[in-house]
């Protein structure tokens, strides 16, 4: 659990909450969707016990990978295909292996793929995001494919204090078994 927390470290001033129990499958796209209010920021400090609740299956959480200094320890390409039924995961995995890319594919909650890259220490978020962006053509992905961290610099939140967290990414291994690599 300590290793998991070290790997998925980022902005700790707030964390995302995803109420997976109320999720439904969109009949048109096949994507798992959440109802309004079931996918939101919780403006409390992200402490180690919250990570443990995620791993134990009590609370599904997400994190903003970019910290207050504009650095990150991980990033990812979020592949949400137009048609999940005919999505060729093997093509993506074959490209990772062919080019010996430091990416780990993990199933997303909607059965797409998150292609993670992990760093030993915090690195400039803009540089990591640029690296991931440059990989999109290799995987035949559109230039508007989601890449996290979405924000490479957090801005001050004058109303709440602290920082505006931007967008979070749901963390894998909810209940220690779901969405494995």
What are these regions (language model features)?
Residues 28, 111, 177-181:
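Short acidic (Asp/Glu) and glycine-rich catalytic loops that position anionic groups and cofactors
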Residues 1-74, 82-92, 149, 167-168, ...:
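DNA replication initiation on ssDNA origins
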Residues 76-77, 96, 102-131, 162-174:
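Histidine-centered divalent-metal-coordination microenvironment in nucleic-acid enzymes
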